[in-house]
Swiss-Prot record:
Protein name, as recorded: 3,4-dihydroxy-2-butanone 4-phosphate synthase
GO biological process assignments: riboflavin biosynthetic process
Pfam family of the protein (one): DHBP_synthase
NCBIfam families in the cross-refs: ribB
Species for this entry: Citrobacter koseri (strain ATCC BAA-895 / CDC 4225-83 / SGSC4696)
Cellular component aspect of the GO annotation: cytosol
Enzymatic class: lyase
UniProt site positions, description: Essential for catalytic activity: 136, 174
UniProt KW keywords: Lyase, Magnesium, Manganese, Metal-binding, Riboflavin biosynthesis
Binding locations of Mg(2+) 1: 38
EC number: 4.1.99.12
Binding site for D-ribulose 5-phosphate: 37-38, 42, 150-154, 174
Quaternary context: Homodimer.
Length: 217
């Protein structure tokens, strides 16, 4: 990742700390991966606190594929089958079947309906019957071990919201340009600045976690 572009957001460790503070303050975070991987930026929010306004922003400026990152334990609790048995996607992204809240939604498409679905899925006592399948929210199962196991946006989302003190569940969506192309680092950074989001890279988060876990051991 081009460090010059990111320098205004601090050092790699500072960027992670700023991202955690942003999440605690109810703001979003722009998570960038490597140019050699997807080379994309994802807007992320804690599933517990994401507002209808933030969901609307995500739908308006994102790919439209709004994803709910969850753990394997949560997937089992909700009895969500993986979307396919044999995942042949380029990066092995862990899509489950799509979901809709069983109650409190109309068509499931609106920002308010998608927030209702997210909240239903992450509720402490959530049951499989609380969700209909298919729907307009795309759960993603994170790999155990987070970014130290797989350097994906799914794992980064779970790691960040957990480090910030939230349940291990977060919403992500890829940022797109107005012409429908994928936003790259310069566009992602400009968007984050305009919308008061912190910016962090998956590489930053890997280094942060490795350093903290070395210290802990």
């Amino acid at each position: 990742m081009n460090q010059t572009l990111l320098s205004s957001f601090g050092t790699p460790f500072e960027r992670v700390e700023h991202a955690l503070s942003a999440l605690r303050e109810g703001r979003g975070v722009m998570v960038l991966d490597d140019e050699d991987r997807e080379n994309e930026g994802d807007m992320i929010f804690p599933a517990e606190t994401m507002t209808v306004e933030q969901m609307a922003l995500t739908i308006r400026h994102g790919s439209g594929i709004v994803c709910l990152c969850i753990t394997e334990d949560r997937r089992k609790q909700l009895d969500l089958p993986m979307m396919v048995e044999n995942n042949t996607s380029a990066y092995g992204t862990g899509f489950t079947v799509t979901i809709e809240a069983a109650k409190g939604v109309t068509t499931g498409v609106s920002a308010a309906d998608r927030v209702t679905t997210v909240r239903a899925a992450i509720a402490d006592g959530a049951k499989p019957a609380d969700l209909h399948r298919p729907g307009h929210v795309f759960p993603l199962r994170a790999q155990p071990g987070g970014v130290l196991t797989r350097g994906g946006h799914t794992e980064a989302t779970i790691d960040l919201v957990t480090l910030a003190g939230f349940k291990p569940a977060g919403v992500l969506c890829e940022l797109t340009n107005d012409d429908g192309t994928m936003a790259r680092a310069p566009e992602c950074i400009a968007f984050a600045g305009k919308h008061n989001m912190a910016v962090v890279t998956i590489e930053d988060l890997v280094a942060y976690r490795q350093a903290h876990e070395r210290k802990a051991s």
